[in-house]
Amino acid sequence: MLRVRILLIYLCTFVVITSTKTIEYTACNDTIIIPCIIDNPTKYIRWKLDNHDILTYNKTSKTTILSKWHTSARLHSLSDSDVSLIMEYKDILPGTYTCGDNTGIKYTVKLIQRHTNWFNDYQTMLMFIFTGITLFLLFLEIAYTSISVVFSTNLGILQVFGCVIAMIELCGAFLFYPSMFTLRHIIGLLMMTLPSIFLIITKVFSFWLLCKLSCAVHLIIYYQLAGYILTVLGLGLSLKECVDGTLLLSGLGTIMVSEHFGLLFLVCFPSTQRDYY
Protein backbone atom coordinates (compact mmCIF):
# COMPACT_ATOMS: atom_id res chain seq x y z
CA MET A 1 0.00 0.00 0.00
CA LEU A 2 2.84 2.34 0.85
CA ARG A 3 4.50 1.61 -2.49
CA VAL A 4 1.28 2.46 -4.34
CA ARG A 5 1.06 5.84 -2.59
CA ILE A 6 4.67 6.66 -3.40
CA LEU A 7 4.07 5.73 -7.05
CA LEU A 8 0.99 7.98 -7.23
CA ILE A 9 2.91 10.89 -5.74
CA TYR A 10 5.72 10.34 -8.25
CA LEU A 11 3.31 10.28 -11.19
CA CYS A 12 1.52 13.41 -10.01
CA THR A 13 4.84 15.21 -9.82
CA PHE A 14 5.48 14.61 -13.53
CA VAL A 15 1.95 15.18 -14.80
CA VAL A 16 1.92 17.38 -17.91
CA ILE A 17 0.02 20.62 -17.37
CA THR A 18 -0.48 22.49 -20.64
CA SER A 19 -1.73 26.02 -21.25
CA THR A 20 -2.19 27.28 -24.82
CA LYS A 21 -2.28 30.84 -26.18
CA THR A 22 -2.29 32.38 -29.68
CA ILE A 23 -0.45 35.60 -30.51
CA GLU A 24 0.22 37.46 -33.76
CA TYR A 25 3.28 39.28 -35.05
CA THR A 26 4.06 41.42 -38.09
CA ALA A 27 7.14 42.56 -39.97
CA CYS A 28 6.92 45.80 -38.01
CA ASN A 29 8.15 44.00 -34.89
CA ASP A 30 11.92 44.30 -34.42
CA THR A 31 11.81 41.87 -31.52
CA ILE A 32 9.08 39.50 -30.38
CA ILE A 33 8.35 38.32 -26.86
CA ILE A 34 6.67 34.93 -26.53
CA PRO A 35 5.14 34.80 -23.04
CA CYS A 36 5.56 31.93 -20.63
CA ILE A 37 4.84 31.83 -16.91
CA ILE A 38 5.83 28.76 -14.89
CA ASP A 39 5.56 28.97 -11.13
CA ASN A 40 8.77 27.87 -9.43
CA PRO A 41 10.50 26.12 -12.35
CA THR A 42 12.93 23.49 -11.14
CA LYS A 43 16.15 22.32 -12.76
CA TYR A 44 15.92 23.65 -16.32
CA ILE A 45 13.74 25.57 -18.80
CA ARG A 46 13.38 24.36 -22.37
CA TRP A 47 11.87 26.22 -25.33
CA LYS A 48 10.86 24.36 -28.49
CA LEU A 49 9.48 25.27 -31.91
CA ASP A 50 7.34 22.29 -32.88
CA ASN A 51 9.84 19.45 -32.21
CA HIS A 52 13.05 21.47 -32.49
CA ASP A 53 14.90 22.84 -29.48
CA ILE A 54 15.44 26.61 -29.45
CA LEU A 55 16.84 27.29 -26.00
CA THR A 56 17.65 25.29 -22.90
CA TYR A 57 18.49 27.08 -19.67
CA ASN A 58 20.01 25.21 -16.73
CA LYS A 59 19.13 26.95 -13.47
CA THR A 60 21.73 25.06 -11.52
CA SER A 61 24.77 25.95 -13.64
CA LYS A 62 23.27 29.20 -15.04
CA THR A 63 24.14 28.10 -18.58
CA THR A 64 22.15 28.49 -21.80
CA ILE A 65 22.25 26.26 -24.88
CA LEU A 66 21.00 27.89 -28.10
CA SER A 67 19.97 26.50 -31.45
CA LYS A 68 22.20 27.66 -34.31
CA TRP A 69 19.05 28.79 -36.14
CA HIS A 70 17.91 31.06 -33.31
CA THR A 71 21.06 32.85 -32.19
CA SER A 72 19.18 35.90 -30.88
CA ALA A 73 16.98 33.86 -28.53
CA ARG A 74 17.19 34.64 -24.84
CA LEU A 75 14.98 34.58 -21.78
CA HIS A 76 13.21 37.86 -21.24
CA SER A 77 13.65 37.58 -17.49
CA LEU A 78 15.40 35.23 -15.12
CA SER A 79 12.89 35.64 -12.33
CA ASP A 80 11.37 32.64 -10.63
CA SER A 81 8.21 32.53 -12.76
CA ASP A 82 8.70 34.69 -15.89
CA VAL A 83 10.56 32.60 -18.46
CA SER A 84 9.26 34.37 -21.59
CA LEU A 85 11.33 34.01 -24.76
CA ILE A 86 12.54 37.05 -26.68
CA MET A 87 13.93 36.86 -30.23
CA GLU A 88 14.73 39.19 -33.07
CA TYR A 89 12.46 39.21 -36.11
CA LYS A 90 15.07 37.52 -38.33
CA ASP A 91 14.96 34.38 -36.17
CA ILE A 92 11.19 34.17 -35.80
CA LEU A 93 9.20 31.50 -37.62
CA PRO A 94 5.44 30.95 -37.35
CA GLY A 95 4.49 27.78 -35.56
CA THR A 96 3.83 26.28 -32.14
CA TYR A 97 6.26 27.30 -29.41
CA THR A 98 6.41 25.32 -26.20
CA CYS A 99 8.18 26.12 -22.97
CA GLY A 100 8.44 23.67 -20.11
CA ASP A 101 10.54 22.48 -17.22
CA ASN A 102 11.68 19.07 -16.07
CA THR A 103 8.49 18.49 -14.04
CA GLY A 104 6.43 18.34 -17.23
CA ILE A 105 4.64 21.67 -16.86
CA LYS A 106 4.20 23.15 -20.32
CA TYR A 107 3.03 26.44 -21.76
CA THR A 108 2.19 26.46 -25.48
CA VAL A 109 2.01 29.54 -27.70
CA LYS A 110 0.85 29.42 -31.30
CA LEU A 111 2.62 32.18 -33.23
CA ILE A 112 0.87 33.50 -36.35
CA GLN A 113 2.32 36.00 -38.81
CA ARG A 114 -0.12 38.72 -39.82
CA HIS A 115 0.56 40.65 -43.01
CA THR A 116 0.16 44.42 -42.74
CA ASN A 117 -0.24 47.18 -45.30
CA TRP A 118 2.91 48.50 -46.92
CA PHE A 119 1.92 52.08 -46.09
CA ASN A 120 -0.74 53.31 -43.72
CA ASP A 121 -4.19 54.15 -45.08
CA TYR A 122 -3.60 57.91 -44.98
CA GLN A 123 -0.39 57.72 -47.03
CA THR A 124 -1.94 55.28 -49.51
CA MET A 125 -4.90 57.60 -50.04
CA LEU A 126 -2.59 60.57 -50.68
CA MET A 127 -0.58 58.57 -53.23
CA PHE A 128 -3.71 57.85 -55.23
CA ILE A 129 -4.92 61.45 -54.92
CA PHE A 130 -1.60 62.96 -56.05
CA THR A 131 -1.30 60.52 -58.95
CA GLY A 132 -4.90 61.06 -60.04
CA ILE A 133 -4.67 64.86 -59.96
CA THR A 134 -1.35 64.77 -61.84
CA LEU A 135 -2.85 62.64 -64.62
CA PHE A 136 -5.91 64.91 -64.81
CA LEU A 137 -3.68 67.97 -65.17
CA LEU A 138 -1.66 66.16 -67.83
CA PHE A 139 -4.89 65.50 -69.74
CA LEU A 140 -5.88 69.19 -69.50
CA GLU A 141 -2.40 70.25 -70.63
CA ILE A 142 -2.50 68.03 -73.72
CA ALA A 143 -6.11 69.00 -74.47
CA TYR A 144 -5.29 72.73 -74.28
CA THR A 145 -2.26 72.25 -76.52
CA SER A 146 -4.34 70.25 -79.02
CA ILE A 147 -6.98 72.98 -79.41
CA SER A 148 -4.40 75.76 -79.54
CA VAL A 149 -2.37 74.59 -82.53
CA VAL A 150 -3.07 72.98 -85.87
CA PHE A 151 -2.65 69.21 -85.77
CA SER A 152 0.81 68.01 -86.73
CA THR A 153 3.03 64.99 -86.32
CA ASN A 154 4.60 66.51 -83.20
CA LEU A 155 1.18 67.07 -81.65
CA GLY A 156 0.22 63.49 -82.46
CA ILE A 157 3.37 62.26 -80.74
CA LEU A 158 2.48 64.35 -77.67
CA GLN A 159 -1.02 62.89 -77.52
CA VAL A 160 0.15 59.29 -77.89
CA PHE A 161 2.93 59.84 -75.35
CA GLY A 162 0.45 61.25 -72.84
CA CYS A 163 -1.92 58.30 -73.33
CA VAL A 164 0.90 55.80 -72.78
CA ILE A 165 1.95 57.53 -69.53
CA ALA A 166 -1.65 57.57 -68.29
CA MET A 167 -2.17 53.87 -69.13
CA ILE A 168 1.03 52.81 -67.35
CA GLU A 169 0.24 54.78 -64.19
CA LEU A 170 -3.40 53.63 -64.10
CA CYS A 171 -2.32 49.99 -64.48
CA GLY A 172 0.18 50.58 -61.69
CA ALA A 173 -2.56 51.98 -59.46
CA PHE A 174 -4.68 48.85 -59.98
CA LEU A 175 -1.71 46.61 -59.16
CA PHE A 176 -0.74 48.66 -56.12
CA TYR A 177 -4.16 48.60 -54.44
CA PRO A 178 -4.40 47.55 -51.64
CA SER A 179 -0.90 48.52 -50.51
CA MET A 180 0.42 45.15 -49.37
CA PHE A 181 4.14 44.33 -49.53
CA THR A 182 4.24 41.76 -52.34
CA LEU A 183 5.95 41.60 -55.73
CA ARG A 184 2.72 42.61 -57.45
CA HIS A 185 2.32 45.72 -55.30
CA ILE A 186 5.99 46.68 -55.67
CA ILE A 187 5.61 46.54 -59.47
CA GLY A 188 2.42 48.58 -59.17
CA LEU A 189 4.12 51.30 -57.16
CA LEU A 190 7.02 51.43 -59.63
CA MET A 191 4.55 51.83 -62.49
CA MET A 192 2.75 54.60 -60.60
CA THR A 193 5.86 56.64 -59.84
CA LEU A 194 8.72 56.08 -62.29
CA PRO A 195 6.88 57.23 -65.47
CA SER A 196 6.63 60.68 -63.84
CA ILE A 197 9.96 61.56 -65.49
CA PHE A 198 8.18 61.53 -68.86
CA LEU A 199 5.83 64.27 -67.66
CA ILE A 200 8.79 66.62 -68.07
CA ILE A 201 9.07 65.61 -71.73
CA THR A 202 5.36 66.22 -72.34
CA LYS A 203 5.63 69.61 -70.66
CA VAL A 204 8.60 70.63 -72.84
CA PHE A 205 6.70 69.44 -75.93
CA SER A 206 3.62 71.48 -74.99
CA PHE A 207 5.56 74.66 -74.31
CA TRP A 208 7.57 74.20 -77.49
CA LEU A 209 4.47 73.73 -79.63
CA LEU A 210 2.95 76.89 -78.14
CA CYS A 211 6.21 78.89 -78.36
CA LYS A 212 6.29 79.51 -74.62
CA LEU A 213 9.73 78.23 -73.68
CA SER A 214 11.17 80.85 -71.32
CA CYS A 215 13.11 81.20 -68.07
CA ALA A 216 9.90 80.71 -66.07
CA VAL A 217 9.24 77.46 -67.90
CA HIS A 218 12.76 76.29 -67.11
CA LEU A 219 12.10 76.94 -63.41
CA ILE A 220 8.91 74.87 -63.56
CA ILE A 221 10.78 72.03 -65.26
CA TYR A 222 13.59 72.12 -62.70
CA TYR A 223 11.01 72.14 -59.91
CA GLN A 224 9.34 69.07 -61.39
CA LEU A 225 12.71 67.37 -61.81
CA ALA A 226 13.41 67.99 -58.12
CA GLY A 227 10.06 66.35 -57.33
CA TYR A 228 11.00 63.33 -59.41
CA ILE A 229 14.33 63.01 -57.58
CA LEU A 230 12.48 63.10 -54.24
CA THR A 231 10.10 60.45 -55.55
CA VAL A 232 12.93 58.12 -56.59
CA LEU A 233 14.73 58.59 -53.26
CA GLY A 234 11.52 57.97 -51.34
CA LEU A 235 10.83 54.90 -53.45
CA GLY A 236 14.28 53.52 -52.72
CA LEU A 237 13.74 53.97 -48.98
CA SER A 238 10.29 52.38 -49.16
CA LEU A 239 11.24 49.00 -50.62
CA LYS A 240 10.59 47.21 -47.35
CA GLU A 241 7.65 46.74 -45.03
CA CYS A 242 6.60 49.14 -42.29
CA VAL A 243 8.27 52.27 -43.62
CA ASP A 244 7.33 55.93 -43.59
CA GLY A 245 6.33 57.13 -47.05
CA THR A 246 6.70 60.85 -46.29
CA LEU A 247 9.60 61.41 -48.69
CA LEU A 248 7.80 59.55 -51.48
CA LEU A 249 4.67 61.61 -50.87
CA SER A 250 6.72 64.81 -50.91
CA GLY A 251 8.04 63.93 -54.36
CA LEU A 252 4.59 63.06 -55.74
CA GLY A 253 3.16 66.25 -54.25
CA THR A 254 5.92 68.35 -55.80
CA ILE A 255 5.24 66.82 -59.23
CA MET A 256 1.53 67.56 -58.83
CA VAL A 257 2.20 71.21 -57.90
CA SER A 258 4.56 71.63 -60.87
CA GLU A 259 1.80 70.32 -63.16
CA HIS A 260 -0.49 73.01 -61.72
CA PHE A 261 2.08 75.73 -62.43
CA GLY A 262 2.72 74.37 -65.92
CA LEU A 263 -0.97 74.39 -66.85
CA LEU A 264 -1.47 77.90 -65.46
CA PHE A 265 1.51 79.17 -67.45
CA LEU A 266 0.18 77.55 -70.63
CA VAL A 267 -3.24 79.14 -70.23
CA CYS A 268 -2.42 82.56 -68.76
CA PHE A 269 0.55 83.61 -70.89
CA PRO A 270 -0.36 84.13 -74.56
CA SER A 271 2.02 83.48 -77.39
CA THR A 272 2.09 83.41 -81.15
CA GLN A 273 0.36 80.29 -82.47
CA ARG A 274 2.48 78.06 -84.68
CA ASP A 275 0.95 76.12 -87.51
CA TYR A 276 2.37 72.84 -88.79
CA TYR A 277 1.55 71.29 -92.11
Curated annotation (Swiss-Prot):
Q: Does the keyword Cytoplasm apply?
A: no
Question: Which superkingdom?
Answer: Viruses
Q: Where in the cell is it found?
A: Host membrane
**Which GO MF terms does the UniProt record name?**
thrombospondin receptor activity
Instruction: Please state the protein's primary subcellular location.
Output: host cell
Coiled coil start-end: none
Query: Secretion signal: which residues?
Result: none
List cellular component terms (GO): extracellular exosome; host cell membrane; plasma membrane
User: Where does the sequence pass through the membrane?
Assistant: 124-144, 156-176, 186-206, 219-239, 247-267
The record lists glycosylation at 29, 58
Its family remark reads: Belongs to the orthopoxvirus OPG166 protein family.
What protein am I looking at?
A: Protein OPG166
Q: Which organism is it from?
A: Monkeypox virus
